[in-house]
Amino acid sequence: MLFSVFYLSLFLSVGLLSARRAVPDRSAAVIVPLGCGFGVSLLAVLPALFAVVLGFTLPAAALAAVAAAGIGAALLYRGTRLRGMAKDPDGGALWACLLPVVLITLYLLHTHVLHLVDGAYHTGQSCYGDMPMHLGFIKYIAQSGEFLPRYPLLGGTHRFGYPFLCETVSSVFVVLGADLRTAYLLPVLPAFLSVYGMFWQLARRVTDSAGKACLAFYLFFMGSGLGFAYFLGSADSFAGIFTGFYTTPTNFVEKNIEWVNPIVDLLIPQRATLFGWCVLLPAVYLLWRFCYEGERRLWPWLAALVLPLPLLHTHSALALVLLCLVGGVYTLAQGPRRKTLLPWLGLAAVCGAAWLCQMLPTVLAQS
């Protein structure tokens, strides 16, 4: 387990250096969640690159660590340092906003992911279907070493069409010797920090108000409507949300209620959504600065960040494409065509080539 923690720390350290290099004018309140996004992206990309040649094996994981260390060394050589970050008067508001939700999330992860109680593994109702699938994929990729992976339940005749990089970010820790629960949780922790922190920073950037960013954060992550009110009529009904078998307000068909909370119904059970948003929200933050604030130098960092996005969460990749199309039209209408167009062409060329190479033998091959 200690070796796995060290391995993750290496990738997160390189991610923090990358974030610092990309936005050197920002405070730790931006660098930390943005760095987590970069770190998870690297954790998805580098082991997979070497696994294409060597299989998903220990040598591939070791070479990925060497490559990550090389990137970190190059950034340090170029003078990138984590000390001396800018001060942010709104940094306290971010951490005060995030801390209660982070604590709730940590508790839910503890109780929902292979929680051993009296010899039995416990989870939450939202994970009944998703978690067995994810655990099976994580273990299979690590044990078989086959890459690109194939669906084990289909006799190995079909390659994954599912965005499997959300599984390999945990499979690599199984290869390194971690138990399944540890491997499952290790990359999830920085992913949540990236999602929460970069949502707040994006809202802060768009609204130009820390107060509005806090309001947007809680409306989104703690919202979902009042469908749970039907379960407040008795103590037994309310307790059933936590102890019953499919007795949550998520799909309460008797009252035509669908109550979906982003944390408990999407991010905790659906790893593809979590890791997709972990990269998408930092990417949209960089896209906002690149597109609407004229920071054209950010396009290589944006491209590097989103390299694994189609095989982390295909829907997030599609969302980013649509946002880029809107942003591209906006910027072309605002400034000189040549100066404006070149960064967009660079972003499109890098992402288009990388994403096509990923999707042709996987998602598109199974369509």
List the predicted regions and their residue ranges.
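Membrane-embedded, hydrophobic transmembrane alpha-helices
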Residues: 1-91, 103
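Active-site lumenal/periplasmic loops and adjacent helix-entry segments of GT-C-fold
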Residues: 103-279, 315
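Alpha-helical transmembrane segments at the extracellular/periplasmic loop-to-helix junctions
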Residues: 1-14, 96-101, 130-132, 269-285, ...
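Perimembrane helix-loop-helix junctions
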Residues: 287, 292-297, 319-351
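Membrane-interface alpha helices of multi-pass inner-membrane proteins
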Residues: 264-267, 286, 299-314
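Transmembrane alpha-helical segments
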Residues: 11-18, 45, 72, 195-203, ...
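Hydrophobic alpha-helical membrane-interfacial segments at the cytosolic entry of transmembrane helices
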Residues: 94-103, 215-219, 304, 336-361
